[in-house]
Amino acid sequence: MSTTNGHAAHTNGGPARQQEKVRVAIVGVGNCASAFVQGIHYYRDADPEQQVPGLMHVDLGGYHVRDIEFTAAFDIDVEKVGKDLGQAIWSGQNNTIRFAEVPEHLGITVHRGMTHDGLGKYLSQRITKAPGETADIVGILRDTHTDVVVSYLPVGSEQATKWYVEQILEAGCGFVNCITVFIAREDYWNKRFKKAGLPIVGDDIKSQVGATIVHRTLARLFYDRGVELERTSQLNVGGNMDFFNMLERERLESKKISKTNAVTSIVGHAMEADDVHVGPSDYVPWLTDRKWAHIRLEGQAFGDVPLNLELKLEVWDSPNSAGIVIDAVRCCKLALNHGVAGQLDGPSSYLMKSPYKQRPDDIARADTERFIERYSARTARAKTAAAKGPAAKALASGKAPGVRADGAKGRAKGKK
């Protein structure tokens, strides 16, 4: 297969995209990036036939977890810029749990990114901006043959996000938008990505079992069981830089919209703004990267009798979303392979809080599974092999000795 990433200036998909790896660049090397990188190493030898917590599939559409390769990373923190990615994920204010051993030298140097509004009033108290000029983002993405760019910029980085999106479009990469700046759900940007022949999965990454997905599920349960939801709240506290940054309430507008819509879109009736409160509450340093979510729902049941529900959820915040990102970048890669452009309807609805189209999670998952099956790299290889004869067909199906169904050589399961 070709090693080009098929930049939009040359091709918008098809055979040029169908190499064996998913080449990923990261914008923002914080706790979420750390969990993402750790997750690739933790599950690199996972059995494709086994279910892994937090992943739709170990092998998604022909791409194993280990098929994700990091090509570039960008940050503005003086404690991270210039370091190898394998060191930067443990540097600065990063404080997530260490659940996997990551080599110190991954061969990826963290480049100086663009600041714009990425460093807010509170973050600037803890993070010192690296000196020097912004790196040539477009040139780096092209030179490294990057397929997909993942954004982990801080909440409230409106200008910075849109600046990076312009670089991504010019470089010809797919985009996974993990933050609450609205790109995929906006017609303007959706049209821009379609015109460029590039896919986007967004906006605002869900967690495996996070406050929003739990809140959505409970709100949907009330609806399905005929309980009228009258009031609801979600209060979150944590000890990472995300929560510290969100002490600056002016940066929270899109975050509150994203989390609120994710819940209210599922209840089946309109709710007054004063009856719904969803958002971050406070920063508690000793929680580190842990997050506590306090959720309450108040409703009316049979006979107009009150029915109230309250729970507390405790999670490690960043690993909770890492598996979702692993699925998102692989879906984005499948779209690149086949020239599917614009926001990806199923994957965005299932994996993100603020997609272009909201829908119940079970429907969104089914749509995503259909997307994976339709654009599977295995399916494409099988069709090619069928045209070439029985031997090639056996190779593509994984029936040839020592070959997996995704066409790669078999490998014994090793240490996670």
Residue ranges and their predicted role:
Residues G28-S34, L153-Q159, I179-R185, K206-T212, ...:
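Gly/Ser/Thr-rich loops at beta-strand to alpha-helix junctions
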Residues H57, A293-K399, R404, K409-K416:
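C-terminal active-site/capping subdomain that shapes the small-molecule cofactor and substrate pocket
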